[in-house]
């Protein structure tokens, strides 16, 4: 108990220091003043005359209040743990010790997450994300791999508390998917998932090979911010768009749509293309596809570099040998390794079940070091 109590005190001191740094960074008096100003603004009689501006103000107000509330929770957790330590110095109590250890462990994780979010300072990092997976080299195995990645990113999103909506899906010839697009709604979804763009390589014994041979497959991942008014305000001349329609649905049977509701839009100057199939009408799919296309163009404009498109779009790089960002080896051994950060794990099952935090965090810290 003495050793455990000593460790608990040490953790308490470390977290106290981190909380002090966090308090300075947040500028609590400034946040409180900001809340008062925004509340006064929201109370004005003409507040709703400009609906868009009013919604932006309310969003900022809610986010600022959330920061203050989060700080209050952290402070209370630390104070509760401090009180338990004082009690433990007077009397041994294993249950209280366990409670304090659990509270501090959770507090450390929350501070880690908050500190990581401070690395997400890009103009669209706080937005939701549009994530597209395209099967690459590897035939049916690659299409199956694309479907496996769909599940992996869906599970990761659900664990973060994000909402996932299927925007487009194109089924494989025999199994799996040729392509799929997800809309992931939640704060910082784009900031986290932008680390996933690129080519993902799978090595395994192919379930589609009668001889049980080892197969290498590839899939490309593209990530864009999920934008609202920012994308709508971007004007694209009609002459720059090639819009085509087709039937949506699977390989056959009742799921095939007999009406041409699927929409594909190509931005002719850049070659950027978007396909949307999941809405009920052609008009809805067209609006959805155009919104995604505008988001892609905004990111390209934001980059303002000669090779902006190639760098910002994961599917612009051929999903094949030599282009991968991460290897997933299922056979002859089990290992997932990120080639950019060298972070690796043998817990292949956990990764495929959405345990991506170690890879994402390492990449964000790696990128921050490069930028600095």
Swiss-Prot record:
N5-methylglutamine PTM positions: 254
Localization of this protein: Cytoplasm
Family annotation (InterPro entries): PCRF, Pep_chain_release_fac_I, Pep_chain_release_fac_I_sf, PrfB
PTM per Swiss-Prot/TrEMBL: Methylated by PrmC. Methylation increases the termination efficiency of RF2.
Keyword Ligase: no
Alphabetized UniProt keyword annotations: Cytoplasm, Methylation, Protein biosynthesis
Keyword Protein biosynthesis found: yes
Any single Gene Ontology cellular-component annotation: cytoplasm
SUPFAM superfamilies: Release factor (SSF75620)
Family: Belongs to the prokaryotic/mitochondrial release factor family.
Descriptive protein name: Peptide chain release factor 2
Organism: Synechocystis sp. (strain ATCC 27184 / PCC 6803 / Kazusa)
Organism lineage: Bacteria, Bacillati, Cyanobacteriota, Cyanophyceae, Synechococcales
């Amino acid at each position: 108990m003495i050793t455990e109590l000593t460790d608990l005190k040490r953790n308490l001191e470390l977290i106290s220091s981190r909380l002090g740094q966090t308090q300075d960074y947040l500028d609590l008096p400034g946040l409180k003043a900001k809340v008062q100003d925004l509340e006064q603004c929201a109370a004005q009689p003409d507040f709703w005359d400009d609906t868009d501006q009013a919604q932006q103000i309310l969003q900022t107000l809610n986010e600022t209040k959330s920061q203050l509330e989060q700080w209050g929770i952290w402070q209370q957790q630390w104070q509760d743990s401090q009180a338990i330590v004082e009690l433990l110095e007077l009397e041994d109590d294993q249950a209280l010790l366990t409670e304090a250890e659990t509270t501090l462990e959770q507090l450390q994780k929350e501070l880690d997450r908050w500190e990581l979010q401070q690395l997400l300072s890009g103009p669209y990092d706080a937005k939701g994300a549009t994530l597209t997976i395209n099967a690459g080299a590897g035939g049916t195995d690659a299409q199956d791999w694309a479907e496996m990645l769909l599940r992996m990113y869906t599970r990761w999103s659900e664990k973060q508390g994000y909402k996932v909506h299927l925007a487009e899906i194109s089924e494989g010839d025999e199994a799996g998917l040729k392509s799929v697009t997800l809309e992931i709604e939640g704060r910082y979804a784009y900031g986290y998932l932008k680390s996933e763009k690129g080519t993902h390589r799978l090595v395994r014994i192919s379930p589609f090979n009668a001889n049980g041979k080892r197969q290498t497959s590839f899939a490309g991942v593209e990530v864009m911010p999920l934008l609202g008014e920012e994308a709508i305000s971007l004007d694209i001349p009609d002459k720059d768009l090639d819009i085509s329609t087709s039937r949506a649905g699977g390989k056959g049977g009742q799921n095939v749509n007999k009406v041409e509701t699927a929409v594909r839009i190509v931005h002719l100057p850049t070659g950027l293309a978007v396909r949307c199939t999941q809405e009920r009408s052609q008009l809805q799919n067209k609006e959805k596809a155009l919104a995604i296309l505008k988001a892609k163009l905004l990111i390209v404009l934001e980059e303002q570099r000669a090779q902006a498109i190639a760098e910002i779009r994961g599917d612009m790089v051929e999903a094949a040998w030599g282009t991968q960002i991460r290897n997933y080896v299922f056979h002859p051994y089990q290992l997932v390794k990120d080639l950019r950060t060298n972070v690796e794990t043998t817990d292949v099952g956990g990764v495929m079940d959405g345990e991506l935090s170690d890879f994402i965090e390492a990449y964000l810290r790696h990128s921050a070091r490069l930028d600095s």
